[in-house]
Amino acid sequence: MRVVAGILYIVVMAICGLGIQGGTLQDYPSVYFQDSTLQQDFPTIFFNILAGETYGDFIADLREIVTRTADTKNGSIPVLLNPAHPVPVRERFVKVHLTGRNGKTVILALDVTNLYVAAFSANNVAYFFRDFSALERENLFSGMLTIRLSFTSNYVSLEHKAGVGRENISLGPTPLDEACTKSLWSGTTVTEASIAKALLVVIQMVSEAARFRHIEERVRRSFTAADHDQLTFRPDGLMLSMENEWPSMSLEVQRSIEGGIFIGVVQLQDESFQPLRVDNFNTLSRYTMVALLLFRCGHPRATAGTSSTTPAAAQIIRMPVDVLAGEEYYDEETCTVGEPTRRISGLDGLCMDVRNESNNDGIPIQLWPCGAQRNQQWTFHTDGTIQSMGKCMTSNGYHPGDYVMIFNCSTAPVPDATKWVVSIDGSITNPHSGLVLTAPQAAQTTILLVVRNTHSAKQGRSVGDDVEPIVTYIVGFKYMCLQGNNENNTRVWLEDCAVDRPQQWWALYSDGTIRVDSDRSLCVTSDGHSSRDAIIILTCDGGINQRLVFNTDGTILNPNAQLVMDVRQSNVALRQIILYQPTGNPNQQWMTMITRTRPSLTS
């Protein structure tokens, strides 16, 4: 007979119930036992610290479990379930078994709606945070002696209890092993400070790595280094700010307007703790490689004859599907729509500029070095217009070669020519004519035209106030880095990453080109636009073979050919990168790893 329908409590003072020596866990408020008949079968995954080479597969499996309900129709970045909507208990948590080098195992219970650690167990004792919920209490680690910790699971509380900030805590295989097999396994005989510090290690190496491919890569490298027992790293400013700002970046992505333009700004820091303002999705993705988003808001359903005013959902993210109703979340969580003002940069990093800072009707729009002047400020309105100084950007007609100017929005000679659509790949298109903004040449004072879309670099644009090229190395198949000779008409290939090697550094321009950092007149180029054509380095010319788009699925796409960069035959020894049809295979996966000061990843 069940003694209690829910949970059987035997509440005693921790110091008495466990016979704990003075100075260890003396501030635990209570100990209780749970009814084992309430045990739920949750999805479970395993990771053995001795098998560090499987770390990438472990993180991939974790992402797959927590995104099983994500819509499969649209973009590539899944949004986690909304905790405000009903989620079957059996699908609410995932159990992660972490086994140390001595065979001891710690089990984490992660909430699938946010990847937070809800509770954990070790050595047949379950530990809950101070702010545990009834859902957690009634369904996790039933039948175990259970201890309630005096702190919560957020970073502020954990760092306060640990007495040390994350920036001063080493991460890597040895810290993870010690966290699991010493501090967490021996939780009843160590201080709460030790438990909190251990959790800071575990959370970053599991939950944060699942949220961000950037963090996953840093951790993975620590596992696969030749001397991994000694190899550790500490979080830098970029990593810490990514962890802190995950909710705000999730909100900005979900409410971003077409082209992934943010309504607000995500305030990050670079690795040296200098401010880094991010106002568009492409920049955010290149810095963080965000892989999962917290649910913040949904997009309104488009009614007959209309389209969503926030189409970024279809271009970037996969919204969760209500596991009970089989529909996407909307209702009261609908995203608010804004009208951000940003700069628009393009060919050779030059900005769109209203000539002579004049707001007279008919003044052409030209390329000009980027600055803070008002005639380079463009506001993206919900009616589809893009305006500067109160005037609409419009073409002089619907014919290829017509120039682009500003004009009074209500009296423009070709009314529908004032409407524009910004694509996530950087094209700005007039939907009536299908023509796109184009810079005929890379020179200041060049007047912009509308022409047929060829997906050339002359037609690539980036909307955002950070107009400087992003310098990065590019990690590909087998976690090796893209490298070139930095000379014209030479091939690129993969080598072991050595971040102090200039041949592995690339500058990402707003026109969609990937340039040699040491000579920015040289561009990564496809030697043709057919499958199996080689990827080489050529002098930049703004052509169709030099525009490359980093997709959220990890591929690098040539939008004209609709082919992606591919390590030929998955064989790095061939030293060939080619264009090929998308297959989803690992030899077509790439990631940017950006650092402004270019230290080693393990520093």
From Swiss-Prot:
Entry GO MF terms: carbohydrate binding; rRNA N-glycosylase activity; toxin activity
Ranges: 1-alpha repeats: 348-388
Domain Ricin B-type lectin: from-to ranges: 338-466, 467-593
SS bond list: 297-335, 351-370, 392-409, 481-497, 523-540
Post-translational modification: The precursor is processed in two chains, A and B, that are linked by a disulfide bond. Glycosylated.
PROSITE patterns to which the protein is assigned, alphabetical: RICIN_B_LECTIN, SHIGA_RICIN
SUPFAM superfamilies on file: Ribosome inactivating proteins (RIP) (SSF56371), Ricin B-like lectins (SSF50370)
UniProt keywords, alphabetically: Disulfide bond, Glycoprotein, Hydrolase, Lectin, Plant defense, Protein synthesis inhibitor, Repeat, Signal, Toxin
2-alpha repeats: 478-516
EC assignment: 3.2.2.22
1-gamma repeat spans: 433-466
Tissue: Expressed in rhizome and more abundantly in leaves (at protein level).
Record remark: domains: The B-chain consists of six tandemly repeated subdomains. Only subdomains 1-alpha and 2-gamma possess a functional carbohydrate-binding site.
Protein's UniProt name: Ribosome-inactivating protein PMRIPt
Lineage: Eukaryota, Viridiplantae, Streptophyta, Embryophyta, Tracheophyta
Name of the encoding gene: RIPt
